[in-house]
């Protein structure tokens, strides 16, 4: 079920064929009250070495987790076929993560012969795209990760949200411009409220950037974050409109770039023909 996934992240591994490390990590992301990241073995792991891409979901900073911590997680891993989404390789798993069992995934996510096929659609312009969707089904024990973050800095309460001093101006502006933004938001968990608000602040900051600086992966993550926030009860019609405008502007820029390349190609072809006629 789609609503079981709270967060969707796209991870693009650049120059995949030239990666020398045995294992590589994605950026850290927050789901629920805990930090996570993906771990990929480009040349495979264990019995799958030199045979398959191995891919795992791992709890970041698991050493700092308190005893008794465990999370029931459902997640979906997808190696994206960039030529046809229908051909993407996908695996779904559901289970418990513990302090001492903090990593889970697939040793045989995708055969390397299929992944590295130049015409296969998984490796395009040297890049491999991986999508992870994660949902928290059950929580046992507290996570100190976000609590420690809040304790390190003095926090200020704004409309029931714990806000860092550096965020006060942005949050106040947000509530002044959109006073009904949290009128239907019902979560009482302070850590969850902080997580959602941080996601919202990041999203508004991203959409203030030039559309030229946003990749298709950035826009896909933005849409995913927006969807999660709306499901949680945030009223974000204004932000959805802004995101559509940014995406449309980016599409227009890509079209113009493509037209410039096409014109350049035609000019080259014309110059080559003139050179031949002179011979």
Swiss-Prot record:
The keyword Coiled coil applies. This is MATH domain and coiled-coil domain-containing protein At1g31390. Residues 6-134 form the MATH domain. Residues 235-271 form a coiled coil. It comes from the Eukaryota. SUPFAM superfamilies: TRAF domain-like. Keywords: Coiled coil. It comes from Arabidopsis thaliana.
